[in-house]
Amino acid sequence: MLLSKYFLPILKEEPSEAQVISHKLMLRSGMIMKQASGLYTWLPLGLKVLKNIENIVRSNMNKVGALEVLMPCIQPAHLWIESGRFEYYGKEMLKFQDRHDNTLLFGPTNEDMITDIFRRNIKSYKDLPKNLYHIQWKFRDEIRPRFGVMRGREFLMKDAYSFDINQENAVNTYNKMYKAYINTFRDLGVFAIPVIADNGPIGGNLSHEFHIIAETGESTIYYDKRFKILKDNPDIDVEEIKSWYAAAEEKHDVNKLSSFPEGITSSKGIEVGHIFYIGSKYSVNMNALINDEYGKLIPVEMSSYGIGISRLAAAIIEANCDKKGIIWPFSVAPFKVSLINLNIHDNKCVELAAKTDKELSNKNIEVLYDDTEARPGSKFATHDLIGSPYQVIIGPKKAANNIVELKDRKTGVLEDIEIENLINYIRI
């Protein structure tokens, strides 16, 4: 992609309304643009990040056999009345009447609708288990939206819902999804810790939140130091991981700490995922019954699994940035390589840039080629800001000898590389 043809509205000054670094950097780098309080347009750079996160989440859901559906963002209120949750959300839930005086709402979550879908289509234990998920925009009318897309009013979520014949099977499914979440965050290039948490308005009696460690996190979490080995050992048994101590602040129990010889540490965290074993709360309230193997009608056992996709974009930045800008993990980066031509009027620079762009693109490595007239200092500032994992810098002196500079955005290390060997240094 040629930068001269791209839509990248960079802000030179820090936006005054931004309180956290991710909000500042998302606005400055042209990822998002504010439309109203808590509402943002996702511009091309930001949308690429959002799609990359979405695709990684989708891939991991598919691997555990979850089936994708797409429920409407507008829901009939009668389902929420039936489940008993309609009044609970209060003004946070946006409600309105259609032309036929039906009460509708902009869904903040989907337990009620998915239960309705299940009860209308599945009647026998033979059709279980089922695990359905969707990725959809949601709306919650926050009293005080803040921190950009971290706590906006409109947000993109992945919601999954599992249905099982009994508690034992439901917990087995829960454990599979627990592990799928660990794998998902690993694939996203972030370190997320699963902590015991409250279920809140969803209900149920087993719950884990997944927190990305970041100094700007709103929550304090306490966890066993062994969690750090998950980065390099993703195949550790789920039951072993769940035996390690990890708790959100409201669940922290100092009396249990002596049982964990490895030591407990605490950090600020940003919640990016939440999973719940719900049990039969919704199936009882909404009459979602199935025939068991003896022909008896019983309520189905449910669990709910959420990941905040738009929130993740901001949380990843909070955990991966410096004074110059964003440092994207390779898997979610909008462009993997920034190709910086320092002199677009030098024939050799143009030749090497074109060759590099073609070779990397042929390897399905997304490249943003800076072919603009901007000065070198301005170009470096722009590409440090947008955070491509690698920068390939082409200047006249070194280009004359078929040499380019390769910069690792995370480490800042610069290397002179012969153009023929460049592809070997891009670690995918």
UniProtKB/Swiss-Prot annotation:
Its EC number is 6.1.1.15. It comes from the Bacteria. Keywords: Aminoacyl-tRNA synthetase, ATP-binding, Cytoplasm, Ligase, Nucleotide-binding, Protein biosynthesis. It is found in: Cytoplasm. It holds the Pfam family HGTP_anticodon. One of its GO terms (biological process) is prolyl-tRNA aminoacylation. It catalyses: tRNA(Pro) + L-proline + ATP = L-prolyl-tRNA(Pro) + AMP + diphosphate. PROSITE patterns: AA_TRNA_LIGASE_II (PS50862). GO terms for molecular function: ATP binding; proline-tRNA ligase activity. HAMAP family: Pro_tRNA_synth_type2. Homodimer. Catalyzes the attachment of proline to tRNA(Pro) in a two-step reaction: proline is first activated by ATP to form Pro-AMP and then transferred to the acceptor end of tRNA(Pro). Belongs to the class-II aminoacyl-tRNA synthetase family. ProS type 2 subfamily. This is Proline--tRNA ligase. It comes from Rickettsia typhi (strain ATCC VR-144 / Wilmington).
